[in-house]
A protein has these predicted regions:
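Long, basic/Gly/Ser/Thr-rich N-terminal segments
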Residues: 1-42
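Conserved adenosyl
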Residues: 108
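Nucleotide-activated chemistry modules centered on ATP-dependent adenylation/adenylyltransferase
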Residues: 1-11, 16, 45, 49, ...
Length: 401
């Protein structure tokens, strides 16, 4: 793989052994559509390691043996790429980048992201906004990235919006991030300008510790995506921007509660399709409605029926990503047996007591926060959430067994 930057324009050329259809770090297959993309509003003089890691968040799935950057990188970043992915990276010759003092928040506007931002009210936001690719037709006009950017601007926080068409490098399964970490490509290139030493994400306990989403559906202390000692954590740290998960020890029920009780409540938006509000007609809206109804102890309010294909995931026999939140909702939403989630009761014996561990913070998640920001997270969680007991901690560590 050969990588070239011209300002914020990235182009890359595959070597003979590279593949058009690769796999992201979560093993999901991704097919390449085009070998160029642009990241807007970023400086041309960022540290070379930042350019290298930003490019790697895009090209990693299709790279097999080696990656040649257009500028020298540090030995530390080269070693992280070799140790994590088994690729030879070069040329090597730059001094390593030192971390800055600032923690930025990768801000999407969803409940998890808002909860992370609530813990660090002084941290600047970095918001990724999808824009059309100049060479790829936009067949997804319902994706309202403009609305999310407008909401981010209304938070009253320091917000830097990064525009990019990098999601159009994917042909399949659809436009999206080649790697989940590509959402941070612009933030990485702005790290010198903003003095970043860490970047906070809204990934919660299910994503970090329970193998949620497309992952393993088991306890994952070795999570390659989001653990600080995983390959991505080591790579970001080598570039002087630590991965930080302020809400990595709490469930989506807790992040929902924190977000809805925060000063940013009016800007919370997890749906990418709605304009004046969530569309209420997609899988994510259904899932988040269940969580919100459980937190607010009210009946489910959704137009979605069990006949919709995206709803069927929650009605089949587990395991599946987000299973812990389905159990949480089944135990708390009044009249759940009369909703489309009713059939899921056949697979669980969920009670408030059996799901109470999801209302507390998993202590090891605090321990892996970089020292510069650990005390602030610990204090917030102690005062606003509460720590898990030993028995509750075992529920996390026995997940999937």
């Amino acid at each position: 793989m050969r990588v070239t930057w011209t300002g914020g324009d990235l182009s890359f050329r595959l070597d003979a052994e590279d593949e058009i259809t690769g796999r992201a770090s979560d093993e999901h297959p991704v097919k390449l559509a085009i070998n160029s993309c642009t990241i807007g509003g970023v400086p041309a003089d960022a540290h070379p390691d930042l350019f290298a890691v930003a490019a790697w968040t895009v090209v990693a799935p299709w790279t097999r043996r080696r990656v040649l950057f257009d500028r020298a990188i540090s030995a530390e970043v080269a070693a992280a790429l070799h140790d994590g992915w088994g690729v030879e990276a070069g040329p090597v010759g730059a001094e390593p980048r030192r971390p800055g003092p600032t923690l930025g928040i990768s801000y999407s506007g969803g409940a998890d992201s808002v909860a992370a931002a609530t813990i660090f009210p002084e941290s600047p936001f970095l918001h990724f906004r999808r824009v059309p690719h100049r060479r790829i037709p936009n067949r997804w006009p319902h994706y309202r990235s403009d609305v999310l950017a407008e909401l981010a601007a209304k938070t009253g926080r320091e917000v830097t919006t990064v525009t990019s068409d990098l999601e159009y490098t994917l042909a399949e399964p659809r436009p999206g991030y080649p790697e989940h970490h590509a959402v941070a490509a612009g933030a990485l290139l702005l790290a010198d300008r903003l003095g970043l030493g860490g970047l906070g994400f809204g990934y919660e306990m299910g994503s970090r510790w329970l193998g949620g989403g497309r992952y393993l559906h088991r306890y994952t202390p070795d999570n390659p995506m989001w653990s600080p000692h995983g390959k991505w954590g080591r790579l970001f740290a080598a570039a002087g921007v630590h991965l930080v998960l302020p809400v990595g020890g709490v469930s989506e029920a807790t992040t929902m509660r924190l977000a809805l009780n925060s000063d940013l409540r009016e800007q919370v938006r997890w749906c990418l399709r709605g304009t004046d509000g969530p569309c209420r007609d997609c899988g994510k809206c259904l899932y988040k409605e269940l969580i919100q109804a459980a937190v607010e102890r009210r009946p489910l309010n959704t137009p979605v029926t069990a006949e919709r294909p995206f709803a069927r995931k929650w009605l089949r026999k587990p395991p599946y990503g987000g299973q812990e939140m389905i159990e949480y909702g089944l135990a708390r939403v009044p009249g759940i047996e009369n909703t489309l989630f009713g059939p899921a009761l056949d697979f669980f014996e969920a009670t408030e007591e059996s799901t109470s561990w999801l209302d507390h913070c998993y202590p090891p998640a605090i321990e892996e926060i970089p020292e510069a920001w650990r005390a602030q997270v610990a204090t917030f969680m102690t005062e606003n959430v509460g720590m898990m007991t030993e028995a509750e901690t075992r529920r996390v560590e026995n997940w999937g067994n």
